[in-house]
């Protein structure tokens, strides 16, 4: 699944000062030979004068072209090729595979370090079952994951959410709710924001994940579940207060 939504990806590219950004479907050029890729895409489509890529870049059908072949093909066309050093983390090259693994294993700090920004979602707020409000006294914001998005490790996270022009410390649970749901219930993403009482339905607030707190488990009573939610929320408040002081 995708790590960033299309909107998040475009915003990050725009923040770098890039004024035009294209993301053509891979199927539209996957069968081109390296030679055709250079002539049809770089020359005919873009009239490219310079190309930048990582040292592990491959192109053309079956990844037949590498950076050396790219230089060979571009040189007689007057296209400059610049090879950019790959980002490193923990002594290894950063890749989407490593980031996905970190998210799926609950290593949110590692994922954030490789992303160079907090992992976040901006899905629309949906109506839930109202259990947080009616039975727990802890109203939650529900932002369920689309089918094509990567779902992080299930569990409870210390998060913060952008609402009404400011960041709010929050606690987020991802997974099935064994205390109140059947075993085959869909996975949910619910966020409790202590002190917030606004209406978020239909909005797309940004929710940042900062720390994995604990696994989801079944409680004997609803009060025990409510206590965990409150404890997690207070830990989130303390966590972000400490970050501001640092």
Regions found by a protein language model. Give the residues of each.
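An acidic, carboxylate-rich microenvironment
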Residues: 8, 36, 69, 98, ...
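Residue-level signal for inorganic ion chemistry
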Residues: 13, 51, 111, 159, ...
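Residues at the C-termini of beta-strands that transition into short coil/loop
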Residues: 25, 85-87, 211
